[in-house]
Amino acid sequence: MAHKKAGGSSRNGRDSDGRRLGVKRFGGQDVIPGNIIVRQRGTKWHPGTNVGMGKDHTLFALVEGKVTFQTKANDRTYVSVLPLAAEAAE
């Protein structure tokens, strides 16, 4: 009896490439307007002050400043950008 695996097994063995999602600028990092902060599917992170959201839920900076992440009482994580003027005042 010949010992050969079924010919159909060659139909397996493919996978799609990763989508490169996740945080692109972490807390404390400097950003300029238009910088992508987070790429995501759905709203794992929500836009806070000075952060916009694209149609694919990408979060991006609206002003120049520092990125901050904060979790609020509703268990949502908000991403904000503290403007440079506010940083200088602190």
UniProtKB/Swiss-Prot annotation:
PROSITE patterns: RIBOSOMAL_L27
Gene Ontology CC terms: cytosolic large ribosomal subunit
Region Disordered, annotated ranges: 1-27
Molecular-function GO terms, alphabetical: structural constituent of ribosome
Entries under InterPro entries matching the protein: Ribosomal_bL27, Ribosomal_bL27_CS
Highest taxon of source: Bacteria
GO aspect biological process, one term: translation
Key words, A-Z: Ribonucleoprotein, Ribosomal protein
One Pfam family in the UniProt entry: Ribosomal_L27
The name this protein goes by in its record: Large ribosomal subunit protein bL27
Species of provenance: Xanthobacter autotrophicus (strain ATCC BAA-1158 / Py2)
Lineage, uppermost ranks: Bacteria, Pseudomonadati, Pseudomonadota, Alphaproteobacteria, Hyphomicrobiales
